[in-house]
């Protein structure tokens, strides 16, 4: 073996052992003669440290957070949603641009950055680069500062500072209004609250139906079924907001003119209480404890336009028409979620994944064919379905009974109300299923939910005999950058 190569090899072994095992290195020093060539210092190392000046730093920073975060990191990510946290993220991105040349132009949301940031297309370079690129960078590439620029930071940092800042989402955890609702029943299978398109709230209390105007705060009693020996089990407004349907304990469905306070008709056909109602233009669908779903056109005699849908083996407690009025979703106490169309008397789709009664049903107004459903105490899950293909999509365990679901009209979010054992109201972001807000205040199961016609407020009802109004959703505002006289980059100062 070549002596020079042997000396270099032995020198590397000794250096490695000195860094790992100090006692062994001391022993080697005592055993090595002073005139040995091993002890002579090296003037030129044979290890090369690669230069990473051309690395994709946005991907490298993303790789740091790929592992599971610790509780302290999760707490920091939660704090990052505040104003101070967002300022810290912007400052951190600015430092990465100026010190490391990261080229970040937009501050990412800490809750969605790890989900959506994907590595960009890699550049065609060698695995290791041992010298800087000889190509001269121009001021237009964004990383260098032009000699004629008045800003002390690079072009990429200027774009970062000019990027529009998304306003902080703040949802009040205190209801803006609370109304007393005496005799509001604590029954999971009933639907006693609905909000009309004319901004009038209908509530079934015992044997009566009351109307509350959100514009004038005036309360009127629409009907009293005590004379008939009956009670209210469901209410539902028509799409135009002029008619309200009232389901009764004896199985009748009454149609009332809300403005005139006059009963227009009484529909028969059910043999048990009617707990679910759903309008589709002039057609009214009703679900009952007799396991039957009846569809009737209120403009014609009942027997001429009646359709009987049989598919559930227990009480029907949830009914919702799709936003395009083509499909009807029904949930029952048999843990089934069925989907019907206009042309068939049998369900076109059947989902049996829930482990408890399915009362909470909601069709997405943002994605065609997307259906959400929630299960009772033994299930506690919110499930999402693609009714176009019949495939299940996502599922999340909420930890408590799911009583109601409603999609936001303005954003891809939905709200859920819960019973045993949390009695809470949750706001979710879809499809990430991250929790946006948690509202508490009811002491009983939050069994009833309705949304205002403008889509910004919701009302919840519970067995604690209260109705609580919450500002949950907000209309989308313009993200156009505001031109201010104080803007550093649009005015000469």
Swiss-Prot record:
Pfam families: WD40_CDC20-Fz. The unphosphorylated form interacts with APC/C during mitosis. Interacts with NINL. Interacts (in complex with the anaphase promoting complex APC) with MAD2L2; inhibits FZR1-mediated APC/C activation. Interacts with SIRT2. Interacts with USP37. Interacts (via WD repeats) with MAK. Interacts with RBBP8/CtIP; this interaction leads to RBBP8 proteasomal degradation. Interacts with HECW2. Interacts with SASS6; the interaction is regulated by CENATAC and leads to SASS6 proteasomal degradation. Interacts (via N-terminus) with CCNF. Interacts with CDC6. Interacts with TK1 (via the KEN box). GO terms for molecular function: anaphase-promoting complex binding; ubiquitin-like ligase-substrate adaptor activity; ubiquitin-protein transferase activator activity. Substrate-specific adapter for the anaphase promoting complex/cyclosome (APC/C) E3 ubiquitin-protein ligase complex. Associates with the APC/C in late mitosis, in replacement of CDC20, and activates the APC/C during anaphase and telophase. The APC/C remains active in degrading substrates to ensure that positive regulators of the cell cycle do not accumulate prematurely. At the G1/S transition FZR1 is phosphorylated, leading to its dissociation from the APC/C. The modification Phosphothreonine is found at residue 32. WD repeats lie at residues 182-222, 227-266, 269-306, 311-350, 353-395, 397-438, 441-480. This is Fizzy-related protein homolog. The keyword rRNA-binding does not apply. The keyword S-adenosyl-L-methionine does not apply. Residues 31-51, 64-88, 105-166 are annotated as: Disordered. Pathway: Protein modification; protein ubiquitination. The modification N6-acetyllysine is found at residues 69, 159. InterPro entries: Cdc20/Fizzy (IPR033010), WD40/YVTN_repeat-like_dom_sf (IPR015943), WD40_CDC20-Fz (IPR056150), WD40_repeat_CS (IPR019775), WD40_repeat_dom_sf (IPR036322), WD40_rpt (IPR001680). PANTHER family: CELL DIVISION CYCLE 20 CDC20 FIZZY -RELATED, FIZZY-RELATED PROTEIN HOMOLOG. The lineage of its organism: Eukaryota, Metazoa, Chordata, Craniata, Vertebrata. Residues 76-86, 106-126 have a biased composition (Basic and acidic residues). Acetylated. Deacetylated by SIRT2 at Lys-69 and Lys-159; deacetylation enhances the interaction of FZR1 with CDC27, leading to activation of anaphase promoting complex/cyclosome (APC/C). One of its GO terms (biological process) is positive regulation of ubiquitin protein ligase activity. One of its GO terms (cellular component) is nuclear membrane. Keywords: Acetylation, Cell cycle, Cell division, DNA damage, DNA repair, Mitosis, Phosphoprotein, Repeat, Ubl conjugation pathway, WD repeat. Residues 32-42, 146-160 have a biased composition (Polar residues). Belongs to the WD repeat CDC20/Fizzy family. It comes from the Eukaryota. The modification Phosphoserine is found at residues 36, 133, 138, 146, 151.
